[in-house]
Amino acid sequence: GTYVGAMIYSYDPNKEIDLNSNPKLEYDITDHQDRPFTLTSGDNKLFVGTVPDYGVLGGVLAIFDEDTGKWSQYRNVVEDQSIIGLAYKDGKLYGSTSIWGGLGLDPKAKEAKIFVWDVATSKKIEEFTPAIPGIDETPRMIGEISFGPDGNLWGIVDGTIFAMDPETKEVVKSKTIHPSLYNSSKWLPYRLEWAPDGMLYTTLSRKLVAID
């Protein structure tokens, strides 16, 4: 995914780079979108979440169906919020948001959300703000999110990491490592990387943090 214009390209590593064909433009996400910051896959589909253009609120969930070769997109899955985290499991897509949209416009929402999307019906099942014990501020930006080896959905809220049971939506563990300052990018997700050594590496608060 590229900025500007939220364009999605595919690259064949077995072929030489050709600026006209490899990478190949696959889709241009429309409806005033600019930054495709999160991608995941599942059920033979690619899911892309975006941040809108300057002066605009409301991101897009774009979906490519490999079986049909067709794209679809859905604006404002969470009203007036950008999608900055995606994770797939068992026919459901989990997304997380930032209250901020494009530059030059203040957010309308007060709390970031997690949403659950039914992949088979292309319908949102629910949205909610997780109750995170001990967090120092109301979440305004949640992401990245990722399923861990324990089956929980893990996520980051600025300086806090948490793990949520995807069935009950209960946050079963959390830890505030740094204060929530929100003094860097308001949409770029904090990374979560599950390593072969059993460690979880993150960039919460824009710092490299290793968690055992």
Residue ranges, per PLM feature:
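Repeated scaffold domains used in trafficking and secretory/extracellular systems
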Residues: 31-41, 79-89, 135-146, 181-197
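Surface-exposed loop and turn segments in beta-propeller and other repeat-based domains
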Residues: 15-32, 71-81, 122-139, 175-185
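Short loop/turn segments immediately following the C-termini of beta-strands
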Residues: 3-4, 13, 51-53, 98-101, ...
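A short loop-to-beta-strand structural motif that recurs across blades of beta-propeller domains
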Residues: 7-9, 59-62, 112-115, 160-162, ...
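Blade-level signature of beta-propeller repeat domains, shared across WD40, Kelch, NHL, RCC1
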Residues: 194-212
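Short loop/turn segments that connect beta-strands within beta-propeller blades
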Residues: 12-16, 65-69, 118-122, 165-169, ...
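Short, conserved, GDST-rich strand-edge loop motifs in beta-rich repeat architectures
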Residues: 48-58, 96-112
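Conserved beta-propeller blade signature
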Residues: 1, 45-49, 93-96, 152-155, ...
